[in-house]
Regions:
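Membrane-proximal intracellular helices of multi-pass ion channels
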Residues: 1-160
């Protein structure tokens, strides 16, 4: 199994989370919403460091992975990125448990829209943007994984 190739793609999938947490930090500082700013900064550093470490681990490796490795990659990315997305929910001021914050991140990443919040209208704007960007990341990852699965599909199962 090509663990270095899987870690390369896992490292690449950490960067959209760090970019969108940076966007959320800019939004929070511009509109003076400092309520959960430290959790977004933590998410930025954790996701960027994990992305760098996974890419450093996979340096000078084969980037072409097989079909079953792609399926394992999809499972690992959905689990790991959900852990990264759940950081602002868990360390925010809403006192969510780890399970609730992980559920909120999974529902955002899979774009189902289920929530643990009683009324979403009364959340602070930065958490609403984080919630909507997690839905956006989920849609983006879904499209990327469709392309990843069906790329070189005819060459892997070629009849000779």
């Amino acid at each position: 199994m090509n663990f270095r190739g899987i870690s390369y793609y896992l490292g690449l999938s950490c960067y959209p989370v760090s970019f969108l947490s940076f966007f959320n930090i800019l939004y929070s500082s511009y509109f003076d919403h400092y309520l959960n700013l430290d959790s977004y900064i933590l998410t930025l550093f954790v996701s960027f460091l994990f992305g760098l470490s996974f890419n450093f681990f996979s340096k000078n490796s084969e980037k072409n992975i097989k079909f079953y490795e792609k399926l394992i990659l999809i499972f690992v990315v959905y689990f790991f990125i959900s852990l990264l997305i759940s950081i602002p929910y868990y360390f925010g001021n809403y006192q969510l448990s780890f399970i609730d914050s992980f559920f909120e991140a999974i529902s955002g990443l899979t774009t189902t829209g289920f929530t643990v919040f009683y009324n979403v209208k009364f959340l602070d704007p930065t958490l609403l943007i984080w919630r909507s960007t997690s839905h956006w990341i989920g849609g983006l990852f879904f499209l990327i994984f469709l392309i990843l699965i069906f790329s070189n599909f005819k060459n892997e199962y070629k009849l000779t």
